[in-house]
């Protein structure tokens, strides 16, 4: 009974997570097309170079307490309340520091306009401090339907505002306002669904209990954020702001695809793994199924993006951005492996081993920085190739480190991953070769998507792939219920 209940909650969580992040990516795609057609490379570059500061500050204010709450069997109001007030204090302090540092940031990147833009954009993480607890409550209880609705309305309202501002000459300010409005709307809707209200006085003793676990996550999350944005940061220092904008555009579309799978998995991974970590065999079954599901989605999506990258960019955001296509294709290959990182990270966290998460991330950053410095004189394309190859290879390190927790060998992981990798690669390669003669870009894009998706589906059906059959059965059950 417990297995069935967990399976049902996991299926619902994955379904609504997929709906939420699928909708998010579609809306981001639509709004991104309109904005990229109006804004310049420099506009995107300006917001890109300060994104690392916003994300790091966001990590500091949340301090890993959302994951700490998820590891509790039944967190109380006192636990949530302590985390809320800590987030407010940390967020306010961080905003004050960054507000004062804005002139230094502008000086570092040789962009005086960053003073005003950064001070306004940094409001986004201050506002987000108010929504961390409601978000954690919905996430812990696998209420992904409500999270999906909040994200939908946040994207629609902020996206429409950004487009209106872009078409009325506000340039990079349209991107800044889009970020601030999005998090404001999302927070309001999260509070509507949770009806959670902070109280005074506040008892910070839960923070002290969670601190040992959370501080390692805090450091790890900061390092992970730096790791994800280090290329943008380095490029912002050594290349022209237009080049940063080109890379940012490629990275944005790559992240749109990769984060759909990563965020869908992340919605359920830690709560589910934490629920079964006292049963070794059950946990092993759950983890391997999540691995197969990730491979089933990630490889066709990301290899497909690499295949259609040229026609997709030219059709959607015009040939003004065609220089980002090679970078997008390279990043997409490496991006296919990033969702597996999420699984291993959540395995470590669900066992309370945030130290493993920390050490792996530190090692990743050290090697990655070395690679960037080594290839920095070879140009942006070579740096991105080296970065993507390293991303693929470092997955083996995560597998080795988490193996004592999951009791899953490298060979077992390869058996779960490689079939989908080879099938997706062959389907995309075959589609690419057989459609090269089509000269119309819109027709080429449509034909490649249809042929590749159909071919992938047919091959999996012929091979009786269990994960495909389960997805189809779940879809049938949802249709019958409705």
Predicted regions and their residues:
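N-terminal membrane topogenesis motif
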Residues: 1-29, 67-70, 74-85, 114, ...
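Interhelical loop/hinge segments that connect adjacent transmembrane helices in multipass membrane
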Residues: 1-6, 10, 145, 188-233, ...
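Membrane-proximal transmembrane or re-entrant/amphipathic helices at the cytosolic face
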Residues: 2, 403, 408-410, 417, ...
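Signature of the first transmembrane helix
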Residues: 6-65, 89-102, 124, 154-163, ...
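Membrane-interface junctions at transmembrane-helix termini in multi-pass inner-membrane proteins
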Residues: 7, 11, 68-77, 127-150, ...
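Transmembrane helical elements of multi-pass membrane transporters/channels
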Residues: 13-28, 175-182, 186, 190, ...
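Specific pore-lining/lateral-gate transmembrane helices of multi-pass inner-membrane transport
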Residues: 71-87, 246-362
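Hydrophobic alpha-helical transmembrane segments
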Residues: 115-122, 149-195, 209-213, 249-251, ...
